[in-house]
Amino acid sequence: MNISLKKHNDNVFWFDLCPNDESKFISIYLVIDEKVSLIETGPACSHSNLVEGITKAGLTLDDIDYIIPTHIHLDHFGGGGHIMEVCQNAKALVHPKAYKHVSQIDSWWQGSRDFLGDIADLYGKPKPISESRLISADEGYELSLGKFTIKALHTPGHAPHHITWIYGNDAFVGDSAGLWYSELDQSFPVTPGYYRHDLAIESIEKMRGLDFDYLFYTHFGPRTATNVMSQTRDEFELWMKIVKEGINQKLTSKEILELLFQKRIGLLESDKNHGVHQGSTHLGTVEGMMNWIRRENEKR
């Protein structure tokens, strides 16, 4: 694979991981300060591409000090154990709720297979990481990397173990702000089966108040942050409104997605361009929102 390294600024570099040759899906970031950090690892299947991207930055694997996922879904940290095996000096920073899962992977892997089906096998099975090499990052945890610190902002909603990492005036947002399609100049929500809409909106509001310069999306690439969180909140709320209306009309998830295709410019185009890993992403988001609505209704 011919990985192309991109320079965002003197400290932040990034590349398209291209798992199973799928481009514009996963961005990997390298923060090169006095300490060197790898933000996200991608899935196990793209380990060789990850190594190539690191070396393209003029780094050796021993140069990596920290491996920092936003959360442990397979597309973000499924390759964590694999890269930790060869980055012998690195420690991984994870949410306290993810700590046990990455050291004892059975429930993590089984849950991933139950939710993702064959896609989990495409991503590949994670490897466990020794607890001695894990750092549990509570809310507000800070780590000095040199010129700047990196700070943990817990942003649940997409996942209970989701962290947005703040570096200087920028943020690595993972999936907390949805999916960014630069060619469409549009972002859309992304929600797994156990989505918490209330927490997702709270997380977006937390980020909205921090006045970032740039947002670094895992899906996909850097984006200037001006007005983005307000737009993101509005987009999440609009989707939820349409999903609720669809449920009231007794529509299926596919029928609700068709409504969204009609109402959201660029959504159908983005769906058609999705590769093998993302084929049902927007449908999954509708179903994640439907699941949240049903759980909320059951509480009443």
Residue ranges and their predicted role:
Residues 77-87, 104-105:
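Metal-dependent catalytic neighborhoods of phosphoester/phosphodiester hydrolases
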Residues 245-300:
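C-terminal regulatory/interaction regions
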